[in-house]
Amino acid sequence: MESAKDTTSTSMFILGKPSGNNMESNEERMQNYHPDPVVEESIKEILEESLKCDVSFESLLFPELEAFDLFIPESSNDIASKNVSYSSNVEEGASDEFKTLVAQSVGNCIQSIGASVKAAMKQEQSNMEDNLINSAGLLTLHRSMLERLVLEQLGQLININLLSSASSQFVSCYAKMLSGKNLDFFNWCEPRFIVFACDKFDGLVKKIASESRDLLMDLKANMNNQFITALKNIFSKAYVALDSGKLNMVATSLLLMAHNKEMSNPEISNKEFCKQVNLLKQELLESRNEIIENHVKNMKMFQEFANKQMNQIFMDNCDKTFLKIHINCKNLITAAKNIGIAVLQSIVLCSNEFSWQYLKPRRHQFKITMMNMITHACECIETIYDDTGLIKPLTSSDIMEGYIAINKNRESSICDLNIDPSESILLELADFDEHGKYSEESSIESIHEDDDNVDYLKYMEVQSPTDNNIPTPSKNNESPTRQKLTNIHEKDVGKMYPDTPSPDVPGKSKEAKTFIEYSRQIGKEQTSPNCVCTASVTDLGGPDNFKSITGLESGKHFLIKKLLETQPDSVVVETGSGQQDILAYSPDKRSQTKEWIQEKGSNSKCTETLPGMTFTNSATPVKSHGAIQDTLNPESKLDKEMEAVESLVNLCDGFHDNPLISEMITFGYETDHSAPYESESDNNDETDYIADCDSTVRTNNIHMNNTNENTPFSKSLYSPPEVTPSKEDHKTEKIVAVSQKCKSKKRTAKRKNVPIKPSKSKKIKLDRLPETTNVIVISSESEDEEDGNNIIDKSMLEKTIKSEPNSESSSESDDCTSEDNYLHLSDYDKVINNGHCQSKGFPSPVFTIPIRSMPGTHDIRNKFVPKKHWLWFMRKTHKVDNCVIHSSAKMNVKNDSDVTEANHCFINHFVPIKTDDEEYEKENVSYTYSKIQDSKTDLEDITPTKKLITEMVMENFMDLTDIIKHGIAKHCQDLSSKYTVITHTACEKNLNVANSQNLVTAETQIFDPQGTGNNSPILNIINDTTCQNDENRCTEGTSNDNEKCTIRSDCNSDKMEVFKLDGYPSDYDPFEENAQIY
């Protein structure tokens, strides 16, 4: 009995105590997720207010119990101890005081029921609070993940121009339908109207993206508000009411015992009285357990219902929002595709009626028609979106309807020749005509109206009545042949500019020049001024048409002189398959805003932010060796010279307004060299200008030749075609008229570019290859305008041709190593591409991730997504001071005392850091822009990539910082004292190897800051990778030229040559910056 009493009384007083073990298991079992702070606090407040224990029965029971003195102010522990004393005195006999004390214990049990239930409810509330907060936090996490995915999708819509991307896959298909002047017209119109459509459609995309972001913000707010509202509604009904039935019964029994004097009746033994009290306590215990169990059961039900409600709210809101955004994104792609198709179809149909040279009489109507078509389509899509909230793409036929009609003969016709355009169209048309985004004044051949060209137009009006070679554009008129066009422009240009060596482009207004100069100055701050662009000109008519069609060879010497004045980097003229003429020269900073650079191409949309470029033109080969001599005759007529300038400028123009190329060069990315424009000409007397470019990026074969041949991957990544002399005549003429500089103004070093896949420029193999490969290397070394003395004139070129031994070409393909076939590169290119500076220089960490969103011109943004994993490189740069330039003694330069100091040596070596990566293969570094459209951003690849980059930099941060901080001075001193450059005298044979070998004559170790050691992983890799193959750089093939270049000092007879850093302020020092994490 005693044990029963002890157990019962003790259990009653500890029932309300929470279990610590249970709490720990709950915390271990639950993952810790948290919703937004407002939601979390609201959940706590709701449960605190709703889950209160109703103890109203106390007001009914306690007053009467107190009247009988059945409540005592003692604590439960005191009562327990008195119960113990009572049990020990049970056999001592009846006692009124003892029975009263026992009865009071029952009253105090009743009193403790409320507190016990409240404590149990408090624990249940805490568990429920944790559960609901965790559930809401998990849903919030899921919502955030979906939001990030949607934002990524929206970012891709903005960063990759949809319309340009969608239309690019159709450009080559449509181009194949055309040939001759129809293809010219297509190539002239397509980039302009596509970019106009891109700008129009880009506004719609931005609006969709902005409103989609608003939807995501609304989703967050709505979810949070609905969570709080739902929980309030649910738990407002979840109040806790004590089951007072048994409590009332026990209290009544206790009162009855007091009324009946059982406590003071001596006839009732202590044992009997204790039995009655224990029965009452048992009933109180059962009552307490029932109350708590029922409450827990109810709360679990409410909790489950609340979780279901929150999940339903999440699903309803997310489904509605994300489904809408997904549908709109998908439909935007379809809409862009249809608009692109409509524009291309319209241009193709109109190409039967117009040509780009003879669009002038009806160009106004044509352009307004096209612009109206594009604008109307975008406005219609936007109107539907405003009404329904969804994008409904128009079909391409709907877009074309009402503007372009097709008759039975499949010829095009502009329906409305009396168009009354809106004011907005007129404003856009003005921008289209003058200097802006879609300027058509891009070449000498295109005849356009302009205020600055009145005299020229008057001349044309006078010539038109008598010159039958200028037909009026009409559906029924045949397009003029290329020969006629050539003759026309020979006459026109010759009469317009009889005494001007470098004519301005007709139609190029002063405002345009100012605009472009300003754009270029701004672009210098963020754009690397060097790249190598390749424009392919394929003559499908055969070699016989060379003289009468292109006139490139006939004016080569004149073209060199003109291009030297405009100062791009180099011009490489490829003659035939794999054979090239190299015209390399350095840009003058003050002349980079010449009209030649400002011109816009007929095949691409361009940007004015590239101070210098290298253009490579795959030109038509000549018939014989005599033709080359004839075409290089300095006595060529002025009209042929101008014709050559026109032809090449027309082909090379238009690389500067390309937003993608500008941004890619800024961040050092490569682009593809594929040639989507292919056509087959039916006329053997016409030359089709085929742009090797992807319409998506509007590029004409961008090469960034900065691969390192001695790194494990360079050979496979970039392998230019081997140049082999023609077997018909081994008496080649090699023109080398320069003093080569190790550091020309082609600052490829400033770019953060990486190796790319081999270029596969599509060239037409001709029946007969030219007799020779003429390598013409020309340098302009001074940054001052007065340094025009370095320009090579025609007589000097002729003299140089004759001065070269004919026997050299027999071993031309046997340069120092079998891998060194870079004959289409200058010495400086070779040094950079082979760049292993033996002094190692100091490393500047350039860790790059090609996942970038970059603003292009005209609000067209570009995004680069890696194909797989990224490779890591360190860039090594050098700084040189007080190195004096002296002109070559062999060059016919008037002033031989020009001196320039070199501030920086921009010879970049991209040293691989992860050479042991199993994915370190060329297929993993392909960033072909057209393929990016099919790629997806894989977060699983991006996240570890960023993590890796951070860890690599942070683990070696002190070493890198010390190297950069302390290594500059030492390296500058060492490199200045050892820097030598070979100027070609008898060593033209070793053009690609000698300079790279003799760039620095002594081998030193990388500067190791005191205390850092040379044991960091990055530094070890640099030492390992940059030292390899240095000893045997020039061991093969030297036997062929032992009589020419047996002693290195023979090649070093000239003074040291470096030059001033171009394109940066004089006080700018890029090497004093600390290592930065991307």
Curated annotation (Swiss-Prot):
Ranges of compositional bias, category Polar residues: 1-12
InterPro entries for the chain: HHV6-IE (IPR005507)
Domain of life: Viruses
Pfam families named in the record: HHV6-IE
Region (Disordered): 1-28, 464-483, 703-732, 781-818
Descriptive protein name: Protein U90
Organism expressing this protein natively: Human herpesvirus 6B (strain Z29) (HHV-6 variant B)
Gene: U90
